[in-house]
Design a protein with these regions (language model features):
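Bimodal "functional hotspot" detector
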Residues: 2-13, 17, 21-172
Length: 172
């Protein structure tokens, strides 16, 4: 009888803890959702970190138009002199298309000249900015119509938010 009572108390405490944890995480999610604006990712001047800023961006039209609006924003020089655009000024975007849940971006050949660190920050900033759009889960990159390759010469493929490891991608 005593064992059964202890077991019931233990199960009740466990259920209560689960309920409390579930409520807390929901509240944290709601708090983050209360920040108004669209998340635009920039980098610091040393190009070592991604920095997210919420901005009021007028996203109108179909998915393709929204993607183009966000890409233009990622190319613009920010007002603050402490951050930079993730897409360097000298990099041109040849084309953009949206196919189901994947955005395909084709860069000019100038993209091949950016440093490895700048490349990582650029791709991560683009992926994090575009995948906040409804039904966009991945971004695929190419250079002058050819698939983008990693340092080993392997095609990078479509990248999602989970493609970047936070230990390797500093964020602020």
């Amino acid at each position: 009888m005593k064992k059964r009572k202890l077991c019931m108390i233990f199960l009740l405490c466990l259920a209560l803890m689960t309920l409390v944890v579930g409520c807390r995480s929901k509240k944290e999610t709601n708090d983050q959702g209360n920040q108004k604006g669209t998340a635009i990712y920039y980098t610091n001047n040393d190009v070592t970190k991604l920095i997210m800023k919420k901005e009021n961006v007028k996203l109108e039209g179909n998915q393709q138009q929204k993607v183009k609006i966000l890409l233009k924003k990622l190319q613009q020089t920010p007002k603050s002199n402490k951050i930079r655009a993730v897409i360097p000024k000298r990099i041109m975007i040849n084309g953009v298309s949206v196919n189901t849940n994947i955005v395909e971006i084709d860069f000019s050949t100038g993209y091949k000249r950016i440093s490895e660190n700048r490349d990582l920050i650029c791709r991560a900033g683009i992926v994090y900015t575009l995948t906040q759009l409804k039904d966009i889960n991945y971004v695929s990159f190419s250079i002058s119509g050819e698939p983008m390759l990693d340092t080993d010469g392997t095609a990078i493929g479509a990248l999602g938010r989970d493609s970047f490891v936070f230990g390797k991608l500093p964020m602020k």
